[in-house]
């Protein structure tokens, strides 16, 4: 499995993703990342996007993982 981008926060976090093609973009906390990697159903912020850039905002302390499925290469930044 490829390296999954993540960011740690003690409050609010935003991510901006630039896609080349339509893709599923998920921002998940540590618990839901573990569920995702073990094939269980998981809760996420995001969804299927056909337009770029994608912006997702979350609030909550901890580590957040960015998962991009399909769409080929992408660029991202947490802020």
Identify the function of each model-found stretch.
Residues 1-79:
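Acidic, Ser/Thr/Pro
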